[in-house]
Amino acid sequence: MLIGVISDTHIPDRASEIPEAVFDAFRDVELILHAGDLTSPDILTELETLAPVECVQGNMDRHYGIETPRSRLFEIESFRVGLIHGEVYPRGDTQQLRYLGLELGADVLISGHTHQPFIRELEDMVLLNPGSPTVPRLTDPSVMVLRIDGEKLDAEIIRTGAPVCRSLNFRR
């Protein structure tokens, strides 16, 4: 199964639209998982033109009255895939995310919130974060594509926009 993973779209509060590169990256997916901070349910309608969408509530979604579950668990082939927004502090703390995944009974946990993509393989769980395609934090805009085939899982971070500035030399 091919799955598109996205988070932290923040449309329309911080960005005006989903980049076309997201639609290109998700062209052949069978399912889209959104890890929260939609800030408008309209994003779901747009993504549903590609594939069915499942989502969870992000911290900003509560401010906009978007009522979706705070966590979900999906049985996809031989994997139990958890979906959360991932509001842990410090942001992206793998130990806290692991505990949340264990509470869900997940062997794969997808989260967002950091606006920074990562793939972490722990002893008993894989932690995935697609980053943000619209408002990345000190990294390139991105989404993720998962391929689950029986007992095999492949995850790929896909850049969806221009790279951010990595260095600057400034002189007066």
Swiss-Prot record:
| InterPro entries in alphabetical order | Calcineurin-like_PHP_lpxH (IPR024654), Metallo-depent_PP-like (IPR029052), MPP_YfcE (IPR041802), PdiEstase_YfcE_CS (IPR020935), Phosphodiesterase_MJ0936/Vps29 (IPR000979)
Q: How is the cofactor bound?
A: Binds 2 divalent metal ions per subunit.
Family according to the record: Belongs to the metallophosphoesterase superfamily. YfcE family.
Query: Which residues hold a divalent metal cation 2?
Result: D37, N59, H85, H113
What is the name of this protein?
Answer: Probable metallophosphoesterase MTH_1774
Q: What class of enzyme is it?
A: hydrolase
On the tree of life, the source organism's domain of life is Archaea
An example molecular function term from Gene Ontology annotations: metal ion binding
Swiss-Prot/TrEMBL keywords: Hydrolase, Metal-binding
Q: Where does a divalent metal cation 1 bind?
A: D8, H10, D37, H115
Query: PROSITE patterns, from UniProt?
Result: UPF0025 (PS01269)
What does the record give as EC number? Answer: 3.1.4.-
Q: Which cofactor does it need?
A: a divalent metal cation
Q: Which organism is it from?
A: Methanothermobacter thermautotrophicus (strain ATCC 29096 / DSM 1053 / JCM 10044 / NBRC 100330 / Delta H) (Methanobacterium thermoautotrophicum)
